[in-house]
Amino acid sequence: MSSSNFSCILSISLTFFILLLNKVNSAETTSFSITKFVPDQKNLIFQGDAKTASTGKLELSKAVKNSIGRALYSAPIHIWDSKTGSVANFQTTFTFTITAPNTYNVADGLAFFIAPIDTKPKSIHHGGYLGVFDSKTYKKSIQTVAVEIDTFYNAQWDPNPGNISSTGRHIGIDVNSIKSISTVPWSLENNKKANVAIGFNGATNVLSVDVEYPLIRHYTLSHVVPLKDVVPEWVRIGFSSSTGAEYSAHDILSWSFDSKLNLGFENNINANVSSSTQAA
């Protein structure tokens, strides 16, 4: 065999191997990091009273009665794939503060949520529904998963405060309902920064939550959440908060998100998608 023929065969073989490798490892990824929110935050959709402040924070609901504020990442997220059955792995971290006139009358909390891409708030979402659920749908499937930081006890659906804490404040995992499927007691540190890490394993369907007031308190919980059976294939992610008769300010100071959806042997030339935002 001549050297030219050998080189040609080797080149074809290498090309085939690379194409096969790309086919096997094709994946969709989304990644962004916001270290400081700016007045014209183009990668966010604002709903209700939510807005960015000149101080670099994202203000959700106002510190007034019956306020709702939500902020969504502008690009839809491919959370599972109908062709391969694959479910994405994701990790999101954020820092928040809740500030109230006093530590007794605090309401109602905030949530990180995953919902259909056309999700919008309604006026009946205020108060204990955290801007995500309402009295008509809280027992029905609305294709929504949320992690709530709940500051106000609502007897209709919240865990009995006698069983978890004197105030009823808790962190919860919500699946299609404001009634959490898993909770852990939580104590508010008024106007102090809390760090949150939420992770999802697409292979095990385990959603894990870690909330920490540095050097003060640390909370964890986890639960199996079959995302493929709960939310649409394409979703939006974001934050929501609300107030009722009592109120407090709910602010997000930073936010990062990373997801990866492995598409297996799907030959998708546009399979690798990424986005990145960094505000100094």
From Swiss-Prot:
Known glycosylation sites: 163, 272
GO molecular function terms noted in the UniProt entry: carbohydrate binding; metal ion binding
Alphabetically ordered keywords of this record: Calcium, Glycoprotein, Lectin, Manganese, Metal-binding, Signal
Residues holding Ca(2+): 150, 152, 154, 158
Signal peptide limits: 1-26
Pfam families per the UniProt record, alphabetical: Lectin_legB
GO biological-process terms attached to the record: response to symbiotic fungus
Family membership: Belongs to the leguminous lectin family.
Miscellaneous comment text of the record: Lec2 is probably non functional, since a frameshift mutation leads to premature translation termination after only 98 AA. The sequence below ignores this frameshift mutation. Binds one manganese (or another transition metal) ion and one calcium ion. The metal ions are essential for the saccharide-binding and cell-agglutinating activities.
Descriptive protein name: Truncated lectin 2
Taxonomic lineage: Eukaryota, Viridiplantae, Streptophyta, Embryophyta, Tracheophyta
Gene: LEC2
